[in-house]
A protein has these predicted regions:
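Generic secretory/membrane-interface signal
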Residues: 40-42, 67
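N-terminal secretory signal peptides
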Residues: 1-22, 26, 33-36, 40, ...
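Residues within well-ordered alpha-helical secondary structure of globular protein domains
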Residues: 30-33, 203
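Structured, non-membrane catalytic/scaffold regions adjacent to prosthetic-group chemistry
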Residues: 48-313
Length: 313
């Protein structure tokens, strides 16, 4: 018997170097040891000896320098991991959506370049030095803030999902596209950095009769929605950074609203105006689009909350 195998038997028996009787469990362990020993020792005589892998071409030359890519990007072999749209879904791309490739993502954070897009009048090109945020209406001290003013306020960072209420809509009537990306790709997650909306509202002073807040974007559609004041004072953020860098233009650069847990369209991008009032505004978007048509012909509005969904990637 091989010395190393006898050593194993000795350890299993609990007595180093002594040939003691084996119990049932030790005997089963001994059988496993024999099996492993014979398996390791049964290499055919004509088998090629194991050898280390050969050096690949990229291991035989000097790689690219540190300034080759001043702004990092994915490897060339990941070129297929991109947002995609469905050409026949809308008449044009300016009022449309692009889908995140959920099947290719890892963890919960969506890279900025893969965060889904939803525009109502295309992506504007905004000069942050010229951008302004006006807060007015039922307030004590109306304000017009520059981006430099906003970043001076105390900041906070939080991780939140944003989901379009139409996510999954490709399958509402019947299965149409055999693709996880197109069926469920209107949801993404990021770390957002900015100022609590409550902080800005405290700065202007809220009048007692104020109950609602209208938020408006600077895009060509002047996308706007009405929100209850209570929600705005709870957890809403006015953000200027996403995943550690300035917002991308398609995500609202230089300023957007994040309304945690509520449907994506209320997370107004390119935020330029906040107005406080005593009732909702019933804007075009929240009456003609973001309402629920009921079986009796009536419409149900202000159904902001996004229900939980699940999908296997």
């Amino acid at each position: 018997m091989r010395p190393n195998l006898w050593r194993t038997i000795s350890l299993l028996s609990g007595r180093d170097g002594a040939r003691a009787p084996l119990g049932r469990r030790s005997f089963l362990g001994l059988g496993a040891a024999f099996t492993g020993s014979f398996a390791l020792g049964s290499t055919p005589a004509n088998a090629e000896p194991a050898s280390p892998p050969a050096d690949a071409p990229w291991s035989q030359s000097i790689g690219a320098g540190v300034v080759d890519r001043p702004y990092g990007r994915p490897a060339d072999t990941e070129a297929g991991v991109i947002r995609r749209n469905v050409p026949w879904l809308t008449a044009g791309t300016e009022s449309s959506v692009s889908f995140s490739p959920l099947q290719d993502l890892h963890g919960i954070i969506t890279p900025n370049g893969l965060f889904f897009e939803r525009h109502h009048a295309g992506r504007p090109d905004i000069d942050p030095d010229q951008h302004r945020l006006m807060i007015h209406g039922l307030v004590e001290r109306p304000l017009v803030l520059t981006m430099k003013d906003i970043v001076r306020f105390p900041s906070t960072s939080r991780i939140h999902f944003i989901e379009c209420p139409a996510n999954g809509g490709m399958e509402w009537r019947a299965a149409q596209i055999n693709s996880l990306q197109f069926n469920h790709g209107m949801v993404s997650c990021a770390e957002w950095t900015g100022v609590r909306l409550s902080t800005l509202l405290e700065e202007v002073g809220i009048r007692n009769e104020a109950k609602w807040v209208m938020v408006e974007g600077a895009d060509g559609a002047h996308m706007n929605r009405s929100l209850p004041l209570d929600k705005c004072l709870d957890d809403c953020l006015v953000v200027y950074a996403q995943n550690g860098e300035a917002l991308r233009p398609e995500q609202g650069y230089p300023l957007r609203l994040v309304v945690p847990g509520w449907e994506g369209n209320v997370n107004i991008k390119w935020l330029r105006r906040i107005k406080l009032g005593d009732k909702p505004w019933f804007s075009r978007e929240e009456t003609s689009k973001y309402t629920d048509l009921m079986p009796d012909g009536t419409s149900r509005g202000f159904t902001w909350l996004i229900d939980a969904k699940s999908v296997i990637t």
